[in-house]
């Protein structure tokens, strides 16, 4: 074998190199035998076993089982451990392998498994009307997704379902539990497959014949098939052999082919990314519907069907490992070297495999022993304590009867008194010392705990443990080395597969009448009542025992707390130093200061002796000092004795760890340690837990997660009552604790009932049903009384009241019965007792909700399996868990790169120890997915989360909290990938499970409500979304308080949603509440408070604008709600509950159509100068807020689909130099004071201040915002004279209506105005404005600046150049800068420099997201002229407002020319009439409205800047070809002008930086700073915040940060979806990341956008104007240096050889074209700039069609002409082909053209 190429490198070098390698997505191509290929999305860290897993969830290959993979270089039959990254190229070949009997049977089982979803999971929601209302709650499939012919208007139907479903606090429908997985509306491809007796056939050799099967197809045809080594062979007319059964049946039967194709299509529609609904196991307390139909037989799911080689998982089922020398094996592993991480990983792997094998074998032995006792009545009826015991090699199995008195509790803890044989005191000391000295090897070295299991089964308790530990260390039997982990750790032991069925299919049982069943229930109820009375009597005489045993985790948490506290004290450096001779007693902390002994107090007084010696009481002080010295000597003596005692009790290594912890605890005696630990428990541990609950750092959703959180902190469940007392302001925590106490109290009743009838198993079902009816039903003829305020059975209430008071010290009367969630109690009871029920909608309001047939079976309750196998978690990998914790911490601090690194290493360790598909690894997949999600790598995050979900569903259970969390997280990832309907399906599944577990009154549920609202708005169901938002707000108010920052976030979400509906008065009301809460909680200086203030000012400005529009008579589309003024939140329900008929899609479309027709008619009748109606500004705001990052579009999208472009938010550091972060920032300099960037969408922002509506609500108001214009970044420099030039010349009026070549330039003037101060709030007044007129269907705005005479710009003048940000959006443009209000612009004239920022007023008035963080400086020579400002405002307010409502492709704008007088002082930097403009263009693709410069060649005219025209392209079917042609010409002209301007002005950028450094910066708040969640909990858009049990001790916090963009383009966008845009903080600053809310998925939904890549042209619609041929555009050219996450803006970039093409154009052009020297200079500048950008970009795509561009030329007498030419010429020789030339003339309004022809 060839040597490794890294043998010369040191170990450290290897490590450093490995640390830098992060996982990336790779495409794995697998060549299939049918000469097709499957492209799999893998990750660079995958191995061949992962490729096999990907093939199993691929639609085309999921039926293929027996194969090998080969590589052209690595050879054939690659092992599962081969890394995919080592395969170059990553192309594999799938080779079919010969079958043996086992693999042939497994192949048949796979086919049965794939088709099981059509029959095993009950009715699908599409076909079942009875469960329509539960469809949403059950997360059932949307009919759009899974039905082959979706209904015409599913959105409206979903609206009805939603309004009646999730938001109505109704209890979940258990009958729809499995609908999420059901495809029963499809025809099953086959009816059955039966194993037949082997049939002899001549075509198959006897030794090759494996099996014979009979297959009945969907059409009723019975097919006989023989299985052989080469494949499957059909007998009959068609003798065909195929390697796999599916291909054979497809060739035999067209009906099967069609049905199977429909099934695969349904798989794809259900989830195109995978998560196929097969491979499930019956591992949930609700059994599959197919088993519920015949509970006596309990037909298994295919995976567990023993007839086809399936089983319940695990190893040792056949007894092959019973004789393993367990003691010797465990002892050997405990002695393995473990000093380094590599050694521990090897050791942990062996411990993990051995312990899992031991648990499996011990469980099987325990079940067999219990079954033996149940089968022998003599053993079962014995009165002895031990009913049965046996010894198998090293294992001892003991069976005892569970107690039949509910008040008695049997100790079944694997480390309890019964198991260890120690008394309570000794056990407490043992556990405390174990915790204090715990390290990463503790679990592996604790052989006694590893070698013990305990389970309860059918009323019996079985304990299996090692008989003795090996005294002599003999060599191991190598059993661990021979162990193989099948399927990468998947298919672990399903404890539910060991169920005991309670029903027998006897004829007598089936013949019972309903009356007989009622009699059985009555007698059983009496039996339970009698047992309850006895238990209550015994419980009343029980003494309260508060001192339970101490968990060893408490010691570990305590010492960690002491060390953290000591580190904090070191940082603060205590002011007073202790005496050298003082005995240190450290780490007690403030809560434990009272524990300091009198010795300690005396010691503390010793340092004061020198100070008091100066007094006259010298003798007294001397005696005191002597006493202190003697006491100190006694303390030192006692400490030395304590050290000796601890040394004897602990090993040398353990004592050394305790001593080196630097806490001083090694000086304490055992009793002192116990007392200190108890005080830490009461005064620190439990309050800290409650504090974590209150801050939502931890958010348990059920008893399982609550228990995990408490146990991993060493807290006993007996302390639940104390937790409730401390959680007086956390009603959801109190509810969870009370429910858990009730479940534990009722558990004892059920266990006692089962134990009492254990000898007669036929009665167990009816007795359990009767007990459940008493617990959860409403008794007949029993009314609530003061002694029984609950409407439950009196005995049940008495039991609960006594039990909770005795065991938990909690008064049940303090809890309201109406808050009782019976389904959560039922679920908890089934988990704790081991009951399996049929999935039926139980009527909890009836006296008898449960029948005998509802209770199907009993399953073992395993101490290691419950709470997600705590013991297995302990011996998985301590290093891996520590890395997970480090990843979580790095994520909290915003260090995304470190978080990814730690998470990747943690996953690698857990995969190496546990296997890639073990249940323990799923938590690491989920965490890493969350981290990658925050970096913006949504694709890779989705892959990891899908892995986690697949594992959790199959290994942990369909309702496990981790499974629930995976649903919510995956929904968020799908939403970010623009698959809204798919995301909605999964988030509703998560919501259904949340309702089942924690109910509607929980912060996680409130967060999920907002998630659903966001996705519903994405689908146009705005009213449903508002209902969810309202629910979320009320929930947060009730649970967290009206002044919680999470509640403020809810107010903000509603404010955003209302603003999208143009209900600005309501937005103002809600944002005022938001701001009030944030100011009180966070202070006015917090960024979140400032952002809320900016939002409020924006809303106020829009409300004012709306009032002005109403005063002017402009109709508002949202008058139905906005006109109502300030409504309370609850008043919204009148609007939120619309008439379903009126809000249907048909009526919406009709309204929109009528609205459009009216506008068209009005536009045609109007004159250009007369009918200029103001467009509702909020339309532009709404559409601009919908503009989010496009992640790609499907190739086949019609021209009606939106082509969205993104302008990245600007980030500027406080210092002048531009600093760009390639991984974290989307930044390009924008320096206009009026720049309007892409609006900062609240849901694409930092830390959860995200609006719920990303997409526009297309179906809500019946309008699609067809006419929108870009917000143009501009710098106004006005002269003092304001010239109003109206279009009075009839030639001009005609020119605007005919297809001529004249465009009118109007003049405007204005004066400078200074910026407001940063801290000036509420500056919402309208500034100076100027009117805009429509010129035909097209106009463009012009601003002038004066050039310096002679040279264009000198170094002295270019102190810092202003920037003009050109911006265009072909469909959904960015918002107009909010300084542009209604018909006028608020002019702010100030010199804007890179690295500076605008005023707070400027920012606050701008829509959030439209202004970036930069700074403003005002030269001293620039003095604001207030009079000029006022004059300008008066004049411009007389202008006519503008109506942008024309046809589908109307292009609007305004062209203005302002003449400036040249300053007389050539030395001044920047005069009042002059500004220098620097153009910084984002790389773009699409249509550009450009900016151009017109320089006077002889007469010295001013530079003329034409701002771009934003092209609005929304197609509704009608195309105006004439207008399109006209618009194309102007756009082409402006494109050329933009490049000219850019080339001319970008030259001075290098000189301008130094001049501005001496100016004082004035930092401003950016309204584009996405108002992020002010709270640590998720606010607006968060994944379902489910507590993740990676191990409950590793809660992972999810906060919002930015990272590098994903390397692959995203899938096509969902139509009408508004893409998110996120804000990036400057490099010197970072967002303060609060401790997050929920354990893994605590982050908000939209931390980051998925930026476009340079191949964006492959995903945008090809046709720019509807009805035209596709117009192609050149690839983007980066003018600025490339940024990783740059968002593309559509623009036409001039080609590199434009100068030569200009000459060619002159030769072929018209006589009017005159090329001036200035034009040639500008052309050369453009050439240089574009050439540089091409070099920087380095990635140009081939041009596929014709493009044209325009050049504005200026000749003699200032005649301006536009030269238009095809770009294709520029890349060919001069004589390649002829071309046509089109040009346009631009004239002033003072010039009357001679003709308009």
UniProtKB/Swiss-Prot annotation:
Domain of life: Eukaryota
A molecular function GO annotation: mRNA binding
Spans annotated as Disordered: 124-164, 565-634, 1166-1273, 1341-1384, 1423-1442
This protein's GO CC annotations: cytosol; extracellular region; nucleus
Feature: compositional bias, Polar residues: 604-620, 1224-1239, 1343-1352, 1375-1384
One example of a Gene Ontology biological process annotation: regulation of glucose metabolic process
Residue ranges annotated as motif Nuclear localization signal: 805-812
Pfam families the UniProt entry points to: CLU_N, eIF3_p135, TPR_12
Keyword tags: Cytoplasm, Nucleus, Repeat, TPR repeat
Basic and acidic residues: compositionally biased ranges: 565-587, 1171-1183, 1194-1204
CDD domains the record matches: CLU-central
Ranges for domain Clu: 304-573
Main location: nucleus
Low complexity composition bias: residue spans: 588-597
Subcellular location as annotated: Nucleus; Cytoplasm, Cytosol
SMART domains: TPR
Start-end of each TPR repeat: 880-913, 922-955, 964-997, 1006-1039, 1048-1081
Disruption phenotype: Reduced proportion of the cellular volume devoted to chloroplasts leading to an abnormal chloroplasts distributions. Inhibited far-red block of seedlings greening associated with reduced levels of chlorophyll and chlorophyll a/b-binding proteins of photosystem II (e.g. Lhcb1.2). Lower levels of chlorophyll, especially in plants lacking REC1, REC2, REC3 and FMT/CLU.
Family annotation (InterPro entries): CLU-central, CLU_dom, CLU_N, CLU_prot, GSKIP_dom_sf, TPR-like_helical_dom_sf, TPR_rpt
Ranges of Acidic residues composition bias in the record: 1184-1193
Function of the protein: May act as the scaffold of a protein complex, which sequesters key factors that are required for the G2 to M transition in meristematic tissues. Together with REC2, REC3 and FMT/CLU, contributes to the establishment of the cellular volume devoted to the chloroplast compartment.
Name of the protein described by the UniProt record: Protein REDUCED CHLOROPLAST COVERAGE 1
Source lineage: Eukaryota, Viridiplantae, Streptophyta, Embryophyta, Tracheophyta
